[in-house]
């Protein structure tokens, strides 16, 4: 599926981002008209469909593009060039984002603002179905008057130096990224949480009866933990969490004001944007974004939000954006508690634990090679792996399993420790590798799980903040204790384990096969 695709006549070239759902029907129609295809992609169908209309009598390229796109079902962002007008480029979109920026030297069309490479002062967010012409002679020609959006200039590192991979650089960067998430915008003042980006919610907060967290992949795991944070404070009765890809109209509460919390590292995730489109005409729903990329699609379209401020992530597998998401959700839950209960001042120890998290992460990072050794990694180097935790740690287990899949190519599954006996137990055999997360909150129950697994002679690696467990030190990693956000310390260690295991398996962790950093298609 290399781009650009060229039409059969050779007159048109096209770049496409998205998925066309009815491309097989259109392809069959074109085959009957004598078109020959070089690939099985929906993109080649689009360029040949435009070509078909362009070759009809008295149809110009603008009309041909509109006639073709009117027949497309699905999402697309198209950039088209015609040999008869080589000084112009045509763009049109439906559902898939396109941004256009211009300066005195050139014009850039991109799917996200980072594509401008700090070369533009302003850009335009192209609307669905507006055919835009970019011309060397005439600049940008649109059918809609657009309001310019100011670009945010960001300093980008070009290499992961001094580290071998971006994945490791971003894991090690978490002491700084968490500090940025905590401090940018002055989010803690004495014993109060200040989240100016959520002022919109304040006037509705007494009427909100439903809160729904929505995300995909790593962000979904963060959402589950965010739900637990808020649920533990007993300020809202109905708190749910959904995978954005599975959310539909039937999941919208039947009554009452609803706050929809949407989490996305890129701010461009197609499945989340689909949810925004789904509920945009529902007056009882308030949308809130937790995103990392400033001025991204989701950030622009929600009612209010909080930026993660984790900094740019290059590696496909999310690391620092996950821990920043957890920190933001912790701040959000405490902020919501303050506003809802009018209990403005929080316990000083709560604030101190939150403030200490970046220092504790720094301590782990500085001592990681003594904390995790070759014996630990060899223990886990297998084709199958279980990771078990309870409460919030169940979702840390699931996030670890995702990392093991992404960068180690291991069939890893994360479960609640209590779920093991409901089926996964049947897969346990001698030497089967299991990571067990034993936190203080669930120590007794997880210790019972340990004994059950040990009796099956599985290979167990325990991660815990409890320093006095009677365990073989070669199968036991102790992390610092944080009574408010212990899960961030656990996942930091588990990210390091995933990275080291990827290297042992001779896999480049920065670029997992078949995966993309930003998922802009359903």
Residue ranges and their predicted role:
Residues 9, 13, 17-21, 25, ...:
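Conserved phosphate/anionic-ligand binding catalytic regions in large, soluble enzymes, centered on
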Residues 1-160, 164-167, 176-183, 187-207, ...:
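Conserved short alpha-helical segments that host acidic/polar catalytic motifs at enzyme active sites
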Residues 18, 46, 78, 95, ...:
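A residue-level signal for conserved active-site and pocket-lining positions in enzyme catalytic cores
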Residues 29, 49, 53, 71, ...:
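Generic, well-ordered alpha-helical scaffold segments in large soluble proteins
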Residues 10, 19-21, 83-86, 96-98, ...:
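Short, glycine-/Ser/Thr-/acidic-enriched flexible segments
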Residues 174-178, 182-212, 304-435, 443, ...:
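Active-site phosphate/pyrophosphate-binding segments
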Residues 206-356, 390, 437-482, 497, ...:
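Glycine-rich phosphate-binding loops that contact phosphosugars or nucleotide phosphates
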């Amino acid at each position: 599926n290399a781009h650009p695709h060229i039409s059969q006549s050779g007159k048109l070239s096209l770049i496409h981002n998205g998925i066309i759902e009815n491309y097989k029907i259109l392809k069959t129609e074109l085959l009957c008209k004598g078109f020959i295809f070089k690939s099985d992609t929906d993109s080649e169908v689009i360029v040949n469909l435009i070509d078909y209309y362009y070759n009809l009598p008295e149809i110009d390229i603008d009309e041909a593009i509109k006639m073709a796109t009117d027949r497309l079902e699905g999402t697309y962002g198209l950039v088209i060039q015609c040999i008869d007008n080589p000084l112009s480029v045509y763009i049109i979109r439906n559902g898939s984002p396109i941004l256009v920026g211009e300066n005195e030297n050139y014009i850039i069309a991109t799917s996200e603002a980072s594509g401008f490479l700090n070369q533009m002062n302003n850009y335009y967010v192209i609307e669905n179905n507006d055919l835009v012409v970019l011309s060397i002679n005439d600049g940008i020609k649109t059918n809609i008057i657009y309001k310019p959006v100011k670009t945010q200039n960001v300093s980008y590192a070009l290499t992961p130096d001094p580290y071998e991979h971006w994945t490791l650089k971003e894991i090690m960067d978490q002491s700084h990224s968490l500090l940025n998430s905590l401090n940018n915008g002055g989010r803690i003042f004495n014993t109060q949480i200040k989240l100016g980006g959520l002022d919109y919610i304040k006037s509705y907060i007494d009427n909100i009866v439903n809160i729904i967290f929505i995300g995909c992949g790593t962000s979904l795991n963060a959402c589950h933990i965010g739900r637990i944070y808020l649920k533990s404070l007993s300020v809202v009765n109905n708190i749910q969490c959904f995978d954005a890809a599975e959310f539909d109209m039937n999941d919208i509460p039947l009554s009452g004001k609803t706050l929809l919390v949407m989490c996305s590292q890129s701010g461009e995730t197609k499945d989340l944007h689909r949810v925004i489109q789904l509920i945009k005409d529902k007056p009882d729903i308030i949308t809130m974004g937790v995103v990392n990329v400033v001025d991204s699609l989701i950030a622009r379209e929600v009612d209010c939000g909080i930026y993660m401020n984790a900094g740019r992530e290059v590696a496909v597998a999310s690391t620092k954006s996950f821990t920043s998401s957890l920190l933001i959700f912790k701040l959000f839950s405490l902020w919501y508690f303050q506003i809802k209960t009018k209990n403005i001042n929080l316990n000083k120890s709560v604030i101190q634990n939150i403030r200490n998290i970046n220092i504790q992460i720094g301590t782990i990072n500085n001592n990681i090679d003594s904390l995790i050794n070759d014996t630990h990694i060899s223990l886990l180097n297998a084709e199958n792996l279980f990771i078990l935790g309870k409460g919030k740690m169940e979702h840390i287990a699931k996030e670890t399993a995702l990392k093991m899949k992404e960068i180690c190519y291991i069939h890893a599954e994360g479960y609640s420790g209590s779920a093991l006996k409901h089926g996964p137990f049947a897969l346990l055999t001698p030497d089967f590798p299991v990571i067990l997360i034993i936190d203080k909150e669930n120590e007794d129950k997880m210790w019972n799980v340990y004994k059950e697994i040990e009796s099956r002679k599985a290979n167990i690696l325990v991660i815990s903040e409890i320093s006095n467990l009677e365990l073989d030190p070669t199968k036991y990693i102790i992390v610092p204790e944080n009574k408010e956000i212990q899960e961030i310390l656990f996942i930091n260690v588990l990210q390091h384990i995933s990275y080291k295991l990827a290297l042992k398996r001779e896999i480049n962790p920065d670029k997992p096969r078949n995966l993309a950093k930003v998922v802009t298609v359903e």
